[in-house]
């Protein structure tokens, strides 16, 4: 199966081509450019370098969230357009799981900076989620992590390293970028989704919605994602 996998959920852009589990081509760049401008040219370049045609693709696997609102919208819209135009499978995987491309003992905690000392976070062990991905205050993440004997923090860790070291002097802290190759591997055996119903997993309301809700308290909050 020929797979196109990509992630634009953060400042990094990662794109990979796989044939079943074999990596054919991959590129990850962190140049601060608009993903909406860079994504399709990067895909076109990799497909051409691999000697493939767009019609050769059989499955699209995309990081569905959480992450940058704009980045997720770009990725999901592109994935849906390609899947629909080529009439092929579409699969979404966790952006946080895409940061866990390493083999370590214990629990891996991928984080993405959500500003104001908040993060998008997951807890993974042996490649599997043991706690659902969520948006949380980083102080709560540190408290929850105390139940695990050995932890490794990965992802956008730079702004949180001091807090981690204070709470977990023995913890491993690794800055890591999303891996489109891992995204492709994760999506290889997952069932395809309904293209029309496919949406980003934001895990947090956008700021404009937060501000609107402050002046519309009559809205039933059960219909919205929990605010941190």
What are the roles of these predicted feature ranges?
Residues 13-18, 119-123, 201:
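Short beta-strand scaffold segments in enzyme catalytic cores
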Residues 1-64:
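N-terminal beta-alpha supersecondary unit
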Residues 22, 34, 89-178, 207, ...:
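Surface "functional belts" at beta-alpha junctions
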Residues 174-228:
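Acyltransferase
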Residues 11-29, 162, 172-178, 192, ...:
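Patatin-like phospholipase
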Residues 59-90:
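DPxDG-like acidic metal-binding loop motif
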Residues 30-41, 69-73, 77, 174-178, ...:
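Residues at secondary-structure transition points
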């Amino acid at each position: 199966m020929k797979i196109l996998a990509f992630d634009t959920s953060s400042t990094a852009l990662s794109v990979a081509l796989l044939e079943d589990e074999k990596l054919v081509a991959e590129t990850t760049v962190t140049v601060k450019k608009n993903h909406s401008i860079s994504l399709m040219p990067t895909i076109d370049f990799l497909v051409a370098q691999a000697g493939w045609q767009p019609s050769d693709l059989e499955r699209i696997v995309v990081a569905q969230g959480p992450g940058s609102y704009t980045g997720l919208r770009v990725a999901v819209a592109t994935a849906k357009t390609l899947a629909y135009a080529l009439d092929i499978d579409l699969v979404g995987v966790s952006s946080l799981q895409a940061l866990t491309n390493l083999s370590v003992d214990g629990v891996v905690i991928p984080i993405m900076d959500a500003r104001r000392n908040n993060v998008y976070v997951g807890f993974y062990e042996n490649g599997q989620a043991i706690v659902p991905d969520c948006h949380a205050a980083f102080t709560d993440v540190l408290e929850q992590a105390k139940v695990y004997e050995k932890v490794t923090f990965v992802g956008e860790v730079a702004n949180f390293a001091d807090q981690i070291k204070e709470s977990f002097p023995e913890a491993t802290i690794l800055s890591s970028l999303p891996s489109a190759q891992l995204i492709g591997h994760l999506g290889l055996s997952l069932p395809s989704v309904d293209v029309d119903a496919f949406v980003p997993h934001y895990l947090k309301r956008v700021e404009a919605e937060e501000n609107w809700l402050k002046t519309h308290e009559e809205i039933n909050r059960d219909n919205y994602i929990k605010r941190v």
